[in-house]
Amino acid sequence: MNLSSLPHRLLAAAVALCAIAAPASAERIKDLAQVGGVRGNALVGYGLVVGLDGSGDRTSQAPFTVQSLKNLLGELGVNVPANVNPQLKNVAAVAIHAELPPFAKPGQPIDITVSSIANAVSLRGGSLLMAPLKGADGQVYAMAQGNLVVGGFGAQGKDGSRVSVNIPSVGRIPNGATVERALPDVFAGSGEITLNLHQNDFTTVSRMVAAIDNSFGAGTARAVDGVTVSVRSPTDPSARIGLLARLENVELSPGDAPAKVVVNARTGTVVIGQLVRVMPAAIAHGSLTVTISENTNVSQPGAFSGGRTAVTPQSTIKATSEGSRMFKFEGGTTLDQIVRAVNEVGAAPGDLVAILEALKQAGALTAELEVI
């Protein structure tokens, strides 16, 4: 078995498995679109985590932690003199964020994520004190409090040496917040239901309108644009929910995904759609490797010579150029042929990225090239 060709075979397999194939079966509307107005809302807050085992904020470098603690103690009836700045290591200032799900009602719990703001080493073992969570409108929608679950581990010595595993400065509290205010109900009271596709596609919109009309009668649905389908519905909430329960299970064959190539230039990852084609083209691809090595020489003068020891750097630069590789693609070349041609000459994933970018610039790649 030729082990040298194994990475290239794995590349071909990875690209082939990641290929965006055209859908071969019908999909439900609930998998293709979301109901307009049914969405979550971001919540954010600020609070204090206490009970840390010496891994909290260094308050000399984070004065807002002390200020927050003083404010909290003042609300609890404990007065701290203004000229006193306690040096604490078991308290950390944190940011809290969560998502308020659609139709959430007061009293329901939601999960929250807690992240250190200052220089706390770890939040492990800490407890979040009661903190309000606000929406974009500045209103308080939930109250957060509870014991943190931290997956990472961190420790720091007095000399500044530090060791950490994963990210110990971020934790979660399952069911750590309680909803206090419900969102305004935008679902009831309208005579239409709006369906928004996850990805805009005129073919899918047209087929969705036809599928809904076939199931509920002609004129039930109408296309608004390449993303939105409007469906006539009753205003009674129970009837609307019954209609939606049937509507989201209607099946249709969505339109083919557009020909697209996605390239991650940092990692060399390439995802090529199945419908990608290449016009007739020929490419010569070579590479230049530059190696720079640094050595340090010490010049030691003789005894009693009056000279001084000097350190002189010595640099060695070496450039090597590999032979050019010629690729020739006929009209209508497919994904498999492109990958096979590149792998046969032992090219790396980075070479494939460069070739695809060159084909796009030459107008020979009949697909959208997206670099992430």
Curated annotation (Swiss-Prot):
One of its GO terms (biological process) is bacterial-type flagellum-dependent cell motility. Keywords: Bacterial flagellum, Periplasm, Signal. It is found in: Periplasm; Bacterial flagellum basal body. GO terms for cellular component: bacterial-type flagellum basal body, distal rod, P ring; outer membrane-bounded periplasmic space. Coiled coil: none annotated. InterPro entries: Flag_FlgI. The keyword Signal applies. Residues 1-26 form the signal peptide. One of its GO terms (molecular function) is structural molecule activity. Pfam families: FlgI. The basal body constitutes a major portion of the flagellar organelle and consists of four rings (L,P,S, and M) mounted on a central rod. Assembles around the rod to form the L-ring and probably protects the motor/basal body from shearing forces during rotation. Belongs to the FlgI family. This is Flagellar P-ring protein. It comes from Xanthomonas campestris pv. campestris (strain ATCC 33913 / DSM 3586 / NCPPB 528 / LMG 568 / P 25). The lineage of its organism: Bacteria, Pseudomonadati, Pseudomonadota, Gammaproteobacteria, Lysobacterales.
